[in-house]
Every structure is written in C-alpha cells, then in structure tokens.
C-alpha cells in the first residue's frame, strides 16, 4: 500500500467513526432541563460525555439578583485584579504576528496582562461602551481559582451548594472556581480542558460553539511559536497603551493549539488551509443569565459573549466550577485518536517533501 493509499484509508476510517457516532456521540441540539438528581445527571449526561443546560439553579443567588456594575464597584472598590488586554478581543489564540498582514507567520499569542483596581475596569468598560470605537479589549479571565484568590469579597453572594448534585456525580470536590467578566469584543478561541465544567452565567449571554472530542482529526491542532501582546507605549496608563505582537524569547518555545475558528465560513477556512473542518460537527448554543452549562471534559469549545445593554451591567459575567476529569476509557480513546491523527499528519508531511 502506498502512502497516499494509506492516508485515504485513514480518512475513510475517520468518516466511518463519525458515521457510527452520529446517534450517541454527536449532538444536534442541546437539552434544557431543571435540576436533576445526582444519579440522573450522571446517567444521562456525565457518563455519556453529553453537554446540557440546567435552568433554575441560580435564582436564589445574591449574585444573580444584585450584581450590577455599581454593586460590584462598591464591593470591590480598589481591590487589584488581573485583566487580559488585546487589540482584537482574542486572547490565547493563533493569529498572524503582523496584524496588518494576514499572510505573516502565525503564532500562538497570549494577552498583555496587568493588575488594575477593579473600579478602573468598570470605568474602562463604561468608557468603551459609550465611545463604541475599536478600542483595546479588557477581559477578566484569570483562571487560577480567581474567585477565591482575587474576588473573595464576592464569595457570600455565591451559593455553591446548588451544584452539590454535580459534586456527587463527579465523585470529587471543586478543583477551581473562576470569575469571568468582559464585553462583547472578547472571545475565547477554540480549545478543550481536562476538566468537568459547570459554567454559571450571571449576567448577559455566553455563546458557546461546541464540538465533540471525536472531531479532533478535523481541527488541525499544531505547534506555533509562543508570542505575546507587548505594550510598546510610553507607560501602562490606559490612554498610552499600544500593543504589538512579539515572539517570546525567554524561553523560546512552541505551543500546541487549534488554529481553526468553527464560526468562520467554510470558504474562509479553506482559504486558510483548513478544509477538513467541513467534516466537523459544531453546534452553537446560547447560555442565558441564570442558566448553567454542563460542559464535559475534553469537549472543544469556542466562547463569545453578548451583554444585555438594557441590564445593570455593561459586561457579561460568569462563574465556573472546574472538577478534575476521570482518566478512564474516554481519555484512552481520545489519546488513541490523537496519536493516529499525528501519524497521518507525519505521512502527509513526508509526502510533501
């Protein structure tokens, strides 16, 4: 068998795999349910690695009832928090190193991060909303258990007992609890996490584009030079920040990441060299304020947001709970899929030389 025939055989195997998975691994719609028991949650969703939206859990949260820009500013005041700043709202994403030249080298770019007083973030979001111009995007996305580390003044507004059924189903305690706050410009690029995720939307709407782990062969995960947005302005004051992308040299490294945006048109993805995305199975869902998304471990997801301009917050706000995944048979199957995809890619690259 020639290498080309071998590659075609692999493609055929992937197609058969997806075809057989249609009925039980690939979702075409997402259910909305009321609070389940731990047994129901485990049997119908966790064991099947199946996302679901749960309603009615947050109605008694003080956060859901009272959080507004004014309330949060009054409670947090001059507490310093970590913000991610970018030119385009895309932090931790693959992009051209020269933002004005789409054909320039593609790198994995991290945001410019700095500590500011929370009230400065509120001031910036109000200013950004009024000006409605292409300004810097500020996003609160610090993920190292940020609710407990930087937002502990808000802990009394959250009742984590509403997800006790999830703790029981997962068979573990919460590993990290994170606070998210940002405006419509901020987007999290397509990625996956080794966590079971209970994602609680408090204000606004989170727009998730979900792809099952079985779609891995169609997502072109590759290694890209590590880079960062760097402030080349005269200082870190908001008015003087000027960001440009620079390669990280200390240390120099490559980062494995997915370059594909599943919300782009197929035509654009083909132009970028990603035709296999046509065979993936994306589904876009809206998680509204007061709803909780169960996002299974290893599920690919891209996240955008849409603030409710008539509400008392100009940002979309969410709290999420991470639980360590169980490294069982699903993980073993996924690792096998990764290795076969990697092997096929090596053969393709060999044939190009």
Swiss-Prot record:
Q: Which SMART domains match?
A: JmjC
Any one Pfam family here would be Cupin_8
The protein's organism comes out as: Dictyostelium discoideum (Social amoeba)
Q: Which SUPFAM superfamilies match?
A: Clavaminate synthase-like
Protein name (Swiss-Prot/TrEMBL): JmjC domain-containing protein E
Q: What is the lineage of its organism?
A: Eukaryota, Amoebozoa, Evosea, Eumycetozoa, Dictyostelia
GO CC terms of this entry: cytoplasm
InterPro entries reported for this sequence = Cupin_8, JmjC_dom, RmlC-like_jellyroll
In which domain of life is the source organism classified? Answer: Eukaryota
């Amino acid at each position: 068998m020639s290498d080309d025939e071998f590659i075609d055989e692999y493609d055929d195997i992937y197609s058969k795999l997806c075809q057989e998975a249609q009925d039980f691994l690939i979702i075409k719609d997402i259910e909305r349910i009321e609070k389940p028991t731990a047994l129901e949650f485990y049997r119908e969703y966790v064991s099947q690695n199946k996302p679901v939206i749960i309603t009615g859990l947050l109605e008694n949260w003080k956060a859901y009832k009272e959080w507004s820009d004014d309330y949060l500013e009054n409670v947090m005041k001059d507490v310093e928090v970590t913000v991610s700043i970018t030119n385009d709202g895309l932090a931790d994403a693959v992009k051209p190193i020269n933002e004005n030249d789409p054909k320039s080298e593609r790198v994995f770019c991290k945001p410019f991060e700095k500590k500011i007083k929370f009230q400065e973030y509120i001031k910036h979001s109000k200013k950004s909303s009024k000006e409605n111009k292409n300004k810097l995007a500020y996003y609160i996305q610090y993920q190292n258990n940020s609710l407990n580390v930087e937002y502990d003044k808000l802990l009394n507004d959250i009742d984590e007992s509403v997800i006790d059924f999830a703790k029981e189903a997962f068979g573990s305690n919460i590993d990290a609890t994170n606070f998210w706050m940002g405006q419509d410009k901020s987007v999290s690029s397509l990625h996956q996490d080794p966590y079971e995720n209970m994602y609680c939307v408090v204000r606004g709407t989170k727009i998730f584009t979900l792809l099952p782990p079985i779609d891995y062969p169609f997502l072109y995960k590759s290694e890209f030079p590590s880079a960062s947005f760097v402030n080349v302005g005269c200082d870190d004051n908001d008015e003087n920040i000027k960001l440009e992308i620079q390669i990280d040299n200390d240390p120099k490294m490559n980062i494995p990441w997915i370059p594909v945006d599943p919300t782009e048109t197929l035509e654009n993805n083909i132009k970028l060299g990603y035709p296999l995305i046509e065979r993936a199975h994306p589904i876009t869902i809206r998680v509204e304020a007061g709803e909780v998304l169960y996002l299974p471990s290893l599920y690919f997801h891209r996240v955008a947001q849409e603030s409710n301009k008539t509400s008392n917050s100009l940002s979309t706000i969410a709290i999420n709970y991470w639980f360590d995944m169980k490294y069982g048979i699903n993980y073993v199957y996924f690792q096998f899929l990764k290795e076969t995809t990697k092997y096929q890619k090596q053969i393709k690259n060999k044939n190009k030389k």
